Amino acid sequence: MSAPIIAIDAMGGDFGPHCVVPASIAFLAENSSSQLILVGQPALLEELLSRYPSLDRQRLRVHAASEVIGSDERPSQALRGKPDASMRVALELVRDGRAHACVSAGNTGALMALSRHLLKTLPGIDRPAMVTAVPTEKGHCHLLDLGANVDCSAEHLYQFAVMGAVAAEALGCVSPRVALLNVGTEEIKGNQQVKLAASLLQKAQGLNFSGYIEGDGLYRGEADVVVCDGFVGNILLKASEGLAAMVSARIEQRFRDGLAAKLVGALALPLLRRLRGDIAPARYNGASFLGLQGIVVKSHGSAAEEGFQSALRRAALEVRENLPQRLHGRLEHLLL
């Protein structure tokens, strides 16, 4: 694969270009071979870019789009009502081969609907799934689906497991252990769809299926790929992010309570900073839409500069690893 070219929906998210522009500049500084296309309102983008006079504009250019998809707009409105929206135009650049990937912090439902409409799914895939990395005791695991598919059949869960395993392999995990998230590890536990999915996965050739996993096992690193429907996955992800933020805040507050605590806190500061970095949601920001004929990464809408950089890094890595092509090559051997 040539140098990654990433199209960015510069108007999406809570902070829009005021986050996207500095994050893009920082990303280019650490990725000398990548190129970025900022899609959005040229006047605003050029004004923000003018604050970086030493920027190599051959590696970052602006592509005009006059409309923005709001966070409260329905996917159907995004599909029909705004042909020049920054999100849509960025995806069209990928569809037309002018960019290798799209990154957006905008409306998740609209991004999924437009991605399916413009990029299409890979052969054999019914629905794309959202996947991201979550921290564990042993490093991280890949969790999917994160909300794209609230109701899933057993076949959908099977497809998610296959896609998650192939993606984990592409990103460096050897023979990833695949598990279904469940209310227990015994075979009798779980609803009918989870049980049927487990039966399908047990028969799959070339897939390292390890059975069921509970929520605490996920964080102990008992699996490399954890599969669930989007309803459960989204709640789990948001709860995890909230817990990480609460723990960080509580630790910081405790080390402010009294002189002795402040002294201990000063000594422990390097360790605490490392711990905070290990579990910080910004480090793991960026959910990939697996199963499309193109690379799309969704950044958290509230992500600041560091988090958006993480989403850009994930997109660039998937471009370098030719993830859609690798998925296509493996899926035909693993899908039912």
From Swiss-Prot:
Question: Which SUPFAM superfamilies does this entry report, sorted A to Z?
Answer: Isocitrate/Isopropylmalate dehydrogenase-like
Q: Which reaction is this enzyme known to catalyze? A: a fatty acyl-[ACP] + phosphate = an acyl phosphate + holo-[ACP]
**EC numbers for this chain:** 2.3.1.274
Give a yes or no for keyword Lipid biosynthesis in this entry. yes
- Its predominant location is cytoplasm
List the subcellular locations: Cytoplasm
Residues annotated as coiled-coil are none
What is the annotated signal peptide range for this record? none
| Molecular functions (GO terms) | phosphate:acyl-[acyl carrier protein] acyltransferase activity
- Please provide the record's keywords in A-Z order: Cytoplasm, Lipid biosynthesis, Lipid metabolism, Phospholipid biosynthesis, Phospholipid metabolism, Transferase
In terms of Gene3D superfamilies, this protein maps to: Isopropylmalate Dehydrogenase
Q: What class of enzyme is it?
A: transferase
GO BP: any one term: fatty acid biosynthetic process
Task: Output the Gene Ontology cellular-component terms.
Answer: cytoplasm
| A UniProt-annotated Pfam family | FA_synthesis
User: Does the keyword field hold Calcium?
Assistant: no
Q: In which pathway does it act?
A: Lipid metabolism; phospholipid metabolism
How this chain assembles, per its entry, is: Homodimer. Probably interacts with PlsY.
State the protein's purpose. Answer: Catalyzes the reversible formation of acyl-phosphate (acyl-PO(4)) from acyl-[acyl-carrier-protein] (acyl-ACP). This enzyme utilizes acyl-ACP as fatty acyl donor, but not acyl-CoA.
Q: Describe the family membership recorded for this protein in Swiss-Prot or TrEMBL.
A: Belongs to the PlsX family.
Protein name (record): Phosphate acyltransferase
